[in-house]
């Protein structure tokens, strides 16, 4: 059957009007053509939150600098060895998982459980580690010819004195105090890094003795390792918080600071409570892996949208306030690191330069404790320490996936919502399909597009580029 030219023309006309309708339903000036499309029941709430999703990013006008480029003329920190009050006021609070097994710990106590060995299992020093001072960048070792040489700590491993597979008590860590969120025996580690031009980065590091990996289809856990460093970054401009980045499995997520959920707390100045009420940002720490997320629920582990069986889980478990107990350092002009207190001075700086792994080497395949699945080993290498987490970065992101060749790191404007039964349903929380969906009117059209793009590649593209 032949189709007339008029029929083709009518089809093109219909397609044109449909595309035009969708476009003008999305762009900010859509109400000029169709006034009722701008009826937004959440508009007042968004204005209350101070969200301006289409405003110019301050990063592009006055960018932060690499620490090596910071000088006396453009520095942001006025005093070395002093933590600004705004860093404490805007420090993250962490909801640890309600059924967590492995809680935070103190690095000073942790190191006493280890010997230091190289990749072949040979001892670097004969005795076990006594304290942090035994962690160094270089070691003097006796060579086979009887002479002494200097070797790097690169490729060394803190090797457990106990069999970690049997779950010794020191792997369990310490739980936060109910009500205050204080953990007496688990200080966080804070680095306040001057990025010049008014920018300051506050890196909060959280240490756990053990990483309990995820399950796959009921089998596991996989990817376990002794020692676990997680961290968050709050980026300030002229004393005001602008962004928050949170780590998860070697990657992480960046958010506009105003997008993050916050809770009210009494302000502390010099460690003492005041009557002033402030709002602090919330991070949700996943069960076992301690990966960070901005919402409650099930989160696909490293594989966005497409492989939910490998997942992290978060909820509103015990609240930890790292600002109540921490070791602190500042990094200022000349990339000089300065301890911020007597305890940090006593600990020294050498332990931070240790290039080895904060935990055991991956068990060999023939070790009876080791298991393998198509995706992962049961036990893998321990992590590197804080100075190897790219704190000098100008981008918000610590690193980039192989496919991200343009090295983009957009800050999300809406919280990315978790999946599953525990996820909290809220139209002000992103639904993994990007904020463009929130600008589509009428609601029936938005519902159709939500359905069509659910968990598909379109979702991933929208989510990445629109936040």
Swiss-Prot record:
Disulfide bonds, paired cysteine numbers: none
One cellular-component annotation, GO: endoplasmic reticulum
UniProt topology in membrane: Single-pass membrane protein
Major location category of this protein: membrane
Sugar-bearing residue positions: 74, 145
Keyword Glycoprotein belongs to the record: yes
Location(s), subcellular: Membrane
TM region positions: 17-37
GO biological process: protein targeting to vacuole
Keyword check for Transmembrane: yes
Keywords, ordered alphabetically: Glycoprotein, Membrane, Protein transport, Transmembrane, Transmembrane helix, Transport
Top-level taxon in the UniProt lineage: Eukaryota
Functional description taken from the UniProt entry: Involved in vacuolar protein sorting.
Additional free-text comment from the UniProt record: Present with 623 molecules/cell in log phase SD medium.
Family stated for the protein in its record: Belongs to the VPS62 family.
Name of the protein in its database record: Vacuolar protein sorting-associated protein 62
Protein's organism: Saccharomyces cerevisiae (strain ATCC 204508 / S288c)
Lineage: Eukaryota, Fungi, Dikarya, Ascomycota, Saccharomycotina
Protein encoded by which gene: VPS62
């Amino acid at each position: 059957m032949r189709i007339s030219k008029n029929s083709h023309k009518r089809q093109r006309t219909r397609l044109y009007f449909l595309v035009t309708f969708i476009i003008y339903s999305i762009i900010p000036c859509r109400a000029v053509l169709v006034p009722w499309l701008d009826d937004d029941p959440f508009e007042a709430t968004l204005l209350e939150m101070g969200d301006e999703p289409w405003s110019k990013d301050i990063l592009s006008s006055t960018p932060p600098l690499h620490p090596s480029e910071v000088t006396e003329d453009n520095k942001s920190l006025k005093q070395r060895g002093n933590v600004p009050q705004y860093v404490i006021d805007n420090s993250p609070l962490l909801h640890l998982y309600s059924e967590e097994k492995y809680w935070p710990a103190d690095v000073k106590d942790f190191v006493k459980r280890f010997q230091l060995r190289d990749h072949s299992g040979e001892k670097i020093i004969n005795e076990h580690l006594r304290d942090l001072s035994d962690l160094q960048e270089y070691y003097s070792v006796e060579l086979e010819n009887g002479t002494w040489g200097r070797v790097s700590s690169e490729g060394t491993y803190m090797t457990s004195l106990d069999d970690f597979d049997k779950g010794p008590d020191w792997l369990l860590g310490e739980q936060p105090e109910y009500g205050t969120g204080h953990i007496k025996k688990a200080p966080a580690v804070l680095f306040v890094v001057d990025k010049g031009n008014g920018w300051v980065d506050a890196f909060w590091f959280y240490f756990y003795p053990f990483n309990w990996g995820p399950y796959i289809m009921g089998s596991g856990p996989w990817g376990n390792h002794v020692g676990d460093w997680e961290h968050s970054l709050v980026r300030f401009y002229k004393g005001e918080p602008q962004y928050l980045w949170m780590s998860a499995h070697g990657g992480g997520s960046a958010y506009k600071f105003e997008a993050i959920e916050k809770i009210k707390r009494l302000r502390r100045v010099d460690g003492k409570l005041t009557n002033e009420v402030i709002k602090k940002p919330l991070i949700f720490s996943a069960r076992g892996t301690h990966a960070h997320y901005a919402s409650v629920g099930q989160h696909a582990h490293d594989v966005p949208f497409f492989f939910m069986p490998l997942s992290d889980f978060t909820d509103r478990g015990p609240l930890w306030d790292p600002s109540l107990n921490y070791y602190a350092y500042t990094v200022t002009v000349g990339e000089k690191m300065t301890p911020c207190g007597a305890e940090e001075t006593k600990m020294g700086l050498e332990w931070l330069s240790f290039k080895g792994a904060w935990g055991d080497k991956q068990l060999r395949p023939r070790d009876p404790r080791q298991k393998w699945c198509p995706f992962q080993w049961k036990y893998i290498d321990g992590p590197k320490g804080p100075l190897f987490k790219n704190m000098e970065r100008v981008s918000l992101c610590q690193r980039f996936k192989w496919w991200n060749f343009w090295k983009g790191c957009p800050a999300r404007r809406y919280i990315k919502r978790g999946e599953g039964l525990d996820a909290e349903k809220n139209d002000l929380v992103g639904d993994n399909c990007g904020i463009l969906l929130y600008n589509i009117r009428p609601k029936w059209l938005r519902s159709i597009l939500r359905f069509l793009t659910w968990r598909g590649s379109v979702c991933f593209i929208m989510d990445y580029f629109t936040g």
